[in-house]
């Protein structure tokens, strides 16, 4: 990879997940200066927060991000959320272009009568798992019920069992 000569354009990329990082990479390759904004404390998006720990151990997302930032012409500002402390109109006024790669912002809530402590959505639970230095600090019950049928549900079930849940349904 070699960066093209300075193009004289500055681009804002909102979201430091796979799409935002890929966009920043291609823009930097063409000689554009890129500022990536992300609401989370670390970049990487679902690669950092959404892949179960048993599937991708270590800091692979941060290693990739560190490599990307060494290319030149790319900076990242974490903890900046679009619409709160980062107005879209301001970005449009300060940059030649804005690329929105905001990704998944939430999950569907399950309405369960009598819900109590211990009920968590799988996306947040997997995120907590990925960010925990000691996986045994992440709470898991002896009997775990996972509601859902996608890969996130499978990841939550497998990770629960790996952490010592006696029964996972």
Predicted regions and their residues:
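Flavin (primarily FAD) binding-site architecture
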Residues: 101-119
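Solvent-exposed alpha-helices and their adjacent loops that cap or buttress functional pockets
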Residues: 3-6, 70, 90-93, 112, ...
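Rossmann-like dinucleotide/flavin-binding elements
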Residues: 12-37, 77-87, 92, 106-108, ...
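N-terminal glycine-rich dinucleotide-binding loop that anchors FAD/FMN and/or NAD(P) in oxidoreductases
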Residues: 50-77, 113-129, 135
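Conserved N-terminal/central alpha/beta ligand/cofactor-binding core
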Residues: 47-48, 64-97
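Fe-S ferredoxin-like electron-transfer domains
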Residues: 1-35, 39-40, 47-55, 65, ...
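Residues at alpha-helix termini
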Residues: 29, 70-71, 101, 162
